[in-house]
Amino acid sequence: MTINCVWEHNGRDTLLYAVDFVGAYTRGETLEAAVRKMQAEICSYLKWCGKKAVTSMDIAIIEEKVSELAICDADSDVLFESERAPLTAEEYKKLKALALKSAQDFLALYDSVPDKNATAAPERKTFYGQVPRTA
């Protein structure tokens, strides 16, 4: 299987996005480090979707974005070429189903937190006020 990827970097850090697996990406200090993580990311993604994992894959860089942002913090400003075209009704339905599955999974995770007011994070203020520290 070939995984088409968009490589976003700032010369020091890398974000590598799997174009055909919405939301799947890896990070690394180098492109090579991010590529090494991609198979595990795709296998995890396929498992989440209820699909069979792949045993081998090739990575194809189909687009590159040089960024001025702090890639190490996962800041991003890339827009994939494949995202520029209008969505078909079928593409919209598939993306909507993924978003709803993600929301349902997040809600299940949130609901599993026994004490939503408990925190292990220290208090921290910004110029906007207190940073949230609980579920």
Language-model-detected regions and their locations in the chain:
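Aromatic-glycine hotspot motif
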Residues: 1-134
